[in-house]
Design a protein with these regions (language model features):
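PTP/DSP superfamily signal
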Residues: 80-88, 105-156
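Short, solvent-exposed loop/turn segments at secondary-structure junctions
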Residues: 31-34, 52-54, 96-98
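Glycine-rich, flexible N-terminal cofactor/catalytic loop recognition
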Residues: 1-49
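Short, amphipathic alpha-helical segments
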Residues: 69, 98-101, 119-123
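Generic beta-sheet signal
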Residues: 24-26, 87-91
Length: 156
């Protein structure tokens, strides 16, 4: 079963990620006009996208800084292509926890094996890609008060 891993841009030239092998894909997410890191490992396919880490409820000055529906559709197509061809996938963004995490999470939903990494998926990226797959996506609501109660063993 192919796997998918999210990581930070700085991890790519240092190879601080699993070696994806010869049948592999690298998806690079950068800010517009951002630096594209050169990978230390070889990848069969490399794909680059530019969009900011903007959530659905953010208000950017330029809406074109959001991930577009066209980009989401292409990302889903690439993940399906990689999965169908049993390609391991490494996906990076600047910090490796939001944009790349959303893409990795969608890949796991498609069927990729998970490589344990911290993820805080970008909700807009998740919503658009899940819609392209025809799957529902609800923004998770996190109950910090309940977590605190459990952590402290206290009752409010």
């Amino acid at each position: 079963m192919p796997w998918i891993e999210n990581c930070a841009a700085d991890d790519i030239p240092r190879a601080y990620h699993h070696d994806a092998g010869p049948n592999s894909m690298l998806i690079q997410i950068t800010d517009p006009a951002g630096t594209i890191p050169s990978p230390r490992h070889l990848f069969k396919e490399k794909h680059h996208f530019e969009f900011l880490d903007i959530e659905d409820d953010d208000q950017p000055d330029d809406p074109e800084m959001f991930i577009s529906e066209t980009q989401a559709k292409e990302l889903v197509r690439l993940l399906k292509h990689a999965y169908d061809n049993r390609m391991n996938v490494v996906v990076h963004c600047y910090a490796g926890v939001s944009r790349s995490a959303a893409i990795a999470q969608v890949g796991i939903n498609i069927g990729f094996d998970e490589v344990e990494k911290f993820r805080s998926p970008n909700t807009r990226v998740m919503r658009l890609m899940m819609a392209e797959l025809g799957l529902p996506y609800e923004v998770p609501h996190h109950n910090w008060r309940e977590d605190y109660r459990k952590y402290m063993g206290a009752k409010f």
